[in-house]
């Protein structure tokens, strides 16, 4: 059971609409007293993807709107930035691009981790993955204001897992037909494929070092960039890699990113972005506080590493990438806005709020 006063059915909405907001609902409150952000002189990244760091962009009053870890962020059709945290008082914070808090809500989860935005007709929904380290993992679909509309079945309840198999989901992806893929990144390392209605279809992957297996499938997304048809990109974090699969789970290829313990792949246009939680900075080991951001072009070539060493290829092979400028501790996700600025969420970073990177090149 979560060590919070909330249950699955509990729902609490808090928001902080500023002057000019269209509505104020009961229980909403203003956000007062947050320190104003400032631009740093630091510019990070290489080539056409260089960024100026904005310090304190999303800082809030810790007494009223605390965070534990800032796990992931998405941008909705209105340009709002929705971020998931594992602080049970504030599972989702909703910002504008200026760093002002617009709203917050919670399901009381103390291990909320993955956040995926899905457009379904004229509506948008969120898929939230709850690790469930202290109780049980679950994946729920919600409206943008936090109303649960669907809960996927636990794999042990439908005979997909044995009763003692670990289930700690980290991410979801939604196919063009509405099918749902769940990455059990902190559990048994399977990708679970469900229909839009929540009916189990198949699983693939599992823990191991074969091409079609994973070591921490932390993230997953549907890649629409190939005109031949969409595919799945799945993180294999301990392998420092993304692995590509067909939508029915057939392995296609591996994109090796030496030194980079990448989180989920994030696509905008032809470009792929990812937070790097750790790099192999010391003796080729996973090093604490060594994160950065990595950016790849459509061909899978790394073109910039904000906070990291410049990408280098020798005889067509990517060389070791590590942190160079200590702007970040552990980058857990990247959100890209409509001006191609970046918002970086961090895990294990002293309960810090997101960092904004303004694109300058």
Each model region followed by its residue ranges:
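N-terminal export signals
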Residues: 2-4, 10-32
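Blade/loop signatures of beta-propeller domains
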Residues: 35-55
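Surface-exposed loop and turn segments in beta-propeller and other repeat-based domains
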Residues: 55-64, 149-163, 167, 201-212, ...
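Blade-loop segments of beta-propeller domains
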Residues: 61, 90-93, 97-120, 131
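Beta-rich, blade/repeat-based domains predominating
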Residues: 63-78, 109-122, 157-179, 209-231, ...
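Conserved beta-propeller blade signature
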Residues: 81-83, 125-127, 180-181, 231-233, ...
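Loop/turn-rich, solvent-exposed surfaces of beta-rich toroidal or solenoidal domains
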Residues: 260-309
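Blade-level signature of beta-propeller repeat domains, shared across WD40, Kelch, NHL, RCC1
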Residues: 330-361
């Amino acid at each position: 059971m979560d060590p919070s006063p909330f249950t699955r059915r509990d729902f609490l909405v808090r928001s902080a609409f500023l002057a000019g907001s269209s509505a104020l609902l009961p229980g909403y409150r203003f956000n007062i007293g947050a320190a104003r952000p400032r631009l740093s002189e630091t510019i990070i990244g290489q080539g056409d993807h260089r960024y100026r760091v904005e310090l304190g962009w999303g800082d809030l009053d810790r007494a009223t709107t605390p965070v534990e870890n800032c796990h992931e962020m998405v941008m909705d059709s209105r340009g709002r930035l929705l971020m998931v945290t594992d602080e049970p008082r504030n599972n989702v914070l909703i910002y504008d691009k200026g760093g002002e808090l617009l709203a917050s809500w919670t399901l009381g989860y103390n291990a909320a981790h993955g956040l995926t935005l899905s457009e379904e007709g004229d509506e948008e929904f969120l898929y939230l993955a709850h690790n469930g380290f202290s109780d049980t993992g679950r994946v729920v679909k919600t409206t943008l204001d936090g109303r649960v509309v669907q809960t996927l079945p636990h794999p042990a309840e439908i005979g997909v897992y044995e009763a003692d198999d670990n289930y700690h989901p980290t991410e979801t992806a939604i196919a063009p037909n509405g099918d749902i893929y769940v990455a059990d990144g902190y559990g048994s390392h399977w990708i679970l494929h469900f229909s839009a209605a929540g009916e189990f279809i198949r699983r693939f992957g599992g823990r191991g070092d074969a091409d079609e297996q994973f070591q921490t499938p932390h993230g997953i997304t549907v890649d629409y960039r190939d005109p031949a048809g969409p595919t799945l990109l799945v993180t294999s974090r301990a392998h420092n890699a993304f692995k590509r699969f067909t939508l029915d789970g057939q392995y296609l290829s591996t994109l090796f990113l030496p030194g980079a313990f990448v989180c989920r792949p994030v696509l905008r246009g032809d470009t792929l972005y990812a937070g790097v939680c750790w790099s192999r900075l010391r003796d080729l080991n996973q090093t604490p506080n060594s994160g950065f951001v990595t950016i790849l072009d459509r061909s899978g070539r790394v073109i910039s590493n904000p906070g990291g060493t410049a990408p280098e290829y020798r005889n067509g092979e990517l060389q070791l990438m590590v942190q160079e400028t200590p702007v970040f501790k552990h980058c857990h996700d990247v959100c890209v806005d409509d001006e191609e600025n970046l918002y970086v969420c961090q895990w294990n970073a002293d309960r810090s709020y997101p960092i904004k990177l303004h694109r300058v090149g």
